[in-house]
């Protein structure tokens, strides 16, 4: 069996060497010649997998180590009898950690009290749903917009218009859909962005085209009160340099790039391939994950809640480092800038998740316990 894989997928040998030969290619440069002889194709979101890539090949299984599937032509897969699998939820926790770190940074700059803000989460799937649970667990006010879930479940969902009108913070976690009943391409365009509340914070860690980047650039030029955090960009790896400069935080599509999340994505695709082939799983992720460099943190029961929240979250992840690295990489030379974007992702340093952290509390601290539990860390 021949497996063709994106060279940046972690743990390829550990999970897949038992199936046969593995050939690695840069994800953005995979072409029909690269995959013609492959039986299995493993990709990330940077590879468009469609008829043009696969027609005439031997590929019968496509695995993407990502939550999103907008880079896969699922209609063609069905027509050609190609089995496929994604990795739902693999990096959800990493994205939540990114959002929390961004909120702390914005609060420092704005002087805003996080518990007193109203949060709007647009898209409540694997990532957005987990963020909603964390924010609710903190006791913060959250409005949720997800028309697909609303249609299926009913429940306490609101419209996008309500989010725009009532929320101080808007965090986007939708898939990218250009058609259908609920398209998300330019979900926030000029008209929607104009309705942002005074002093609003906008976070996009979903897909770049969910926000009209040109309209956002014009808004930020006109309104200094609005803070934008962008991890995803229209046309990436090409980036609108002026928009990046106007953003309060700007990063190169790494919100979900925790070590745990990336390796979890590989594990999920491995499990799917085992099911497809009818083979038993011989490798377990828990045997491959290294121990985190920080395993436990301790607080006094009298610790200030805001300080404890910032200390706990930033002990695991602080987006300001990624923002600084990204800004240093930006270049007026388009080719250099695209290469730097991909290099930052390829060489991204190991980053762990807050759920792997144990917290010891000295004395009675019910509010701290609630906060730690909401974040997903473990009180010991």
From Swiss-Prot:
Subunit structure of this chain's protein: Homodimer.
Taxon lineage: Bacteria, Pseudomonadati, Pseudomonadota, Gammaproteobacteria, Pseudomonadales
Enzyme class: oxidoreductase
NCBIfam families: PRK00257.1 (NF001309)
Main location: cytoplasm
Compartments where located: Cytoplasm
Protein name: Erythronate-4-phosphate dehydrogenase
Binding annotation for substrate: 45, 66, 257
Binding-site list for NAD(+): 146, 174, 205-207, 231, 256
Active-site residues from the entry: 207, 236, 253
Species the sequence originates in: Pseudomonas putida (strain W619)
Job of this protein: Catalyzes the oxidation of erythronate-4-phosphate to 3-hydroxy-2-oxo-4-phosphonooxybutanoate.
Pathway: Cofactor biosynthesis; pyridoxine 5'-phosphate biosynthesis; pyridoxine 5'-phosphate from D-erythrose 4-phosphate: step 2/5
Example of a GO cellular component annotation carried by this entry: cytosol
Biological process terms in GO annotation: 'de novo' pyridoxal 5'-phosphate biosynthetic process; pyridoxine biosynthetic process
Molecular function via GO: 4-phosphoerythronate dehydrogenase activity; NAD binding; protein dimerization activity
């Amino acid at each position: 069996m021949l497996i063709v894989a994106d060279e940046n997928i972690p743990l390829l040998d550990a999970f897949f060497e038992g199936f046969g030969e593995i050939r690695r290619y840069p994800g953005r440069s995979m072409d029909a010649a690269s995959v013609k002889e492959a039986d299995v194709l493993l990709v990330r979101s940077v590879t468009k997998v469609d008829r043009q890539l696969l027609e005439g090949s031997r590929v019968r299984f496509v695995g993407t180590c990502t939550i999103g599937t907008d880079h896969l032509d699922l209609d063609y897969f069905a027509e050609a009898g190609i089995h496929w699998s994604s990795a739902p939820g693999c990096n959800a926790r990493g994205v939540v950690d990114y959002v929390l770190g961004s909120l702390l940074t914005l609060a420092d700059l704005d002087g805003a009290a996080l518990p007193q803000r109203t949060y709007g989460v647009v898209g409540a799937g694997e990532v957005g749903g987990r963020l909603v649970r964390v924010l609710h667990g903190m006791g913060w006010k959250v409005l949720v917009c997800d028309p697909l879930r609303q249609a299926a479940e009913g429940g306490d969902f609101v419209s996008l218009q309500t989010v725009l009108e009532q929320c101080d913070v808007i965090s986007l976690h939708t898939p990218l859909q250009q058609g259908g009943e609920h398209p998300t391409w330019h979900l926030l365009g000029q008209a929607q962005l104009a309705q942002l509340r005074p002093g609003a914070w906008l976070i996009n860690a979903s897909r770049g085209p969910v926000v009209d980047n040109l309209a956002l650039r014009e808004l930020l030029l006109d309104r200094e009160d609005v803070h934008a955090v962008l991890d995803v960009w229209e046309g990436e790896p090409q980036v609108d340099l002026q928009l990046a400069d106007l953003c309060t935080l700007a990063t190169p599509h790494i919100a979900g790039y925790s070590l745990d999340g990336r390796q979890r994505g590989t594990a999920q695709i491995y499990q799917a391939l085992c099911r497809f082939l009818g083979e038993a799983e011989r490798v377990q992720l828990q045997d491959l994950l290294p121990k985190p460099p920080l395993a436990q943190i301790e607080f006094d029961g009298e610790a200030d809640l805001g300080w404890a929240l910032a200390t706990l979250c930033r002990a695991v992840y602080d987006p300001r480092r990624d923002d600084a690295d990204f800004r240093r990489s930006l270049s007026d030379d388009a080719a250099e800038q695209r290469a730097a974007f991909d290099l930052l992702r390829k060489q991204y340093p190991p980053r762990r998740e807050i759920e792997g952290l144990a917290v010891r509390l000295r004395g009675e601290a019910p509010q701290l316990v609630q906060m730690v539990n909401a974040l997903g860390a473990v009180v010991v």
